[in-house]
Amino acid sequence: MAVYTDITDQELEAFLEGYDLGAPLAFKGIAEGVENSNFLLETEKGRYILTVYERRVKAEDLPYFLNMLTWLADRGYPSARPIPTRSGATLSSLRGKPAAIVEFLPGLSVRKPTAAHCREAGEGLAWLHLAGEGYPGRRANDLGQAAWSPLFSKHRKAAEDLKPGLSATIDNDLAQLSLMWPRNLPTGTIHADYFPDNVFFQSNGKFAAAIDFYFACDDAYAYDVAVTLNAWCFEADGSFNITAAKALLNGYERRRPLSPIEKEALPILARGAAMRFFLTRLADWGSTPAGALVRPKDPLEYERKLAVHREGLVLFA
Amino acid sequence: MAVYTDITDQELEAFLEGYDLGAPLAFKGIAEGVENSNFLLETEKGRYILTVYERRVKAEDLPYFLNMLTWLADRGYPSARPIPTRSGATLSSLRGKPAAIVEFLPGLSVRKPTAAHCREAGEGLAWLHLAGEGYPGRRANDLGQAAWSPLFSKHRKAAEDLKPGLSATIDNDLAQLSLMWPRNLPTGTIHADYFPDNVFFQSNGKFAAAIDFYFACDDAYAYDVAVTLNAWCFEADGSFNITAAKALLNGYERRRPLSPIEKEALPILARGAAMRFFLTRLADWGSTPAGALVRPKDPLEYERKLAVHREGLVLFA
């Protein structure tokens, strides 16, 4: 849950004067997204999500994200279209923080995706990759492979505290990833955080929408697939569900067939993707004060995924 | 903000099978109410609030509250109508906890009510008192005057910790309240927690709805007015805004004129109402562990209101 910024009715009214949305009819803080404050806003014109950008999202990156959402919506992709102010800007500010209004998207996220959900999610991801083609915005992946060793060097002690001996294992992983990391894959605009809580389904189980694009960047499409495999296809007991993974890849390839080099790269990409989430969770774990309002996610969940990938996945027989 | 219970998509679907509301289209935890978990639920039939009842609300009291909401809605009062299950029950259960679905009510609560808001709120309260007449449900006010001394005896030390010497002042207040408490006032079903965050306004500033009836009980109507005066008519600096108070009473009397004995009783009722909220905040303050997710409200805010009422209000010249 996340509502870090408290907006009064007077602040809301003043903010909405900048938009052509009519008067507010309802306004409720919602428990969605962990990085920003989100509000359900209903006005005379329709329903929207108002986001106040808090920590981690850099203000200078916001035009990249908001322009991407407009680009995707213009191409029919079901992401939330940003609503421009009267002066045509999609980025505004509220309480001195960056803020934006986007369309409300119906749909429900699923907690325990089935193979059928994975197939739909995979197709939605490929659709996103195709819809994003030609988007002129550029943003390097600041959590990409080159960032991992420097990031780990700052949190080595936290890793040892979690599990004695872990830092040597991670060092070894990082060396192998550096050596084996593929650099010749098709790249483009990727979501980079396509987790189940960022994907909505219709009540009939069909893909409905993707949200929370605030890690989007330029990187290999197949890396986005690898992040998604890690996020959707592990069981609670840490085992990898190959049926779900094949369904996800099958759904993806309905829209965008993977090339042979992408398929070959997937196991190492999945290992790297597990490293990326292990490292950022480790960093959050170490830097979260005891008793903080937001409980950090368990880094060891991704350490276990790393261990599975160390063995090497066989995704394509 | 309050979402204590995490509901998965599968749990939601199973729960909704008990209702004739169609498939779920959207479901979001919302930051509303501090005692229960609330979710915005959109289905094929419309928009609703799903409440999972957590601490403080007694399960055996829920039929009283839900039947009251049905009673009020049947009489045209703008409170949220409970939605019955297929078998006709308004009370259901989810994750082993009591749960109910009620209509979604549009409207916005105001943070800093103006005198105009106070007038509207006062009228809405009188409307509630009239609409509740004849409701057959009975519930004693377990936070009424008789409960205050026993409650304070358990939290005397917390009062001294907050402000040395405070416990003797409160003892004196309690003795005076016991002596002067009026017992011959018109009584009926009251809201008992009619605070600004429990009242919605339309965008034109008109009263829209009242929510959160989970302190409702049988007590003097004028006591409900006194609770409301305390909640709406104090400035942030602790001063009592007599203009706002007169507007509130004026709005109330548009619908239900106060009798001479009710008017005469208001100052002592307001002092007692300040005591009631001081005491429950004191109890929450003492029993909340350091680092808890919910920050208790400041008891001293109501201690300052008590001090104002100790001087005696002149509401009717």
Swiss-Prot record, chains A, B:
Signal peptide: none annotated. One of its GO terms (biological process) is threonine biosynthetic process. It catalyses: L-homoserine + ATP = O-phospho-L-homoserine + ADP + H(+). Disulfide bonds: none annotated. Pathway: Amino-acid biosynthesis; L-threonine biosynthesis; L-threonine from L-aspartate: step 4/5. CDD domains: HomoserineK_II. Keywords: Amino-acid biosynthesis, ATP-binding, Kinase, Nucleotide-binding, Threonine biosynthesis, Transferase. One of its GO terms (molecular function) is ATP binding. Belongs to the pseudomonas-type ThrB family. This is Homoserine kinase. It comes from Caulobacter vibrioides (strain NA1000 / CB15N) (Caulobacter crescentus). The gene is thrB.
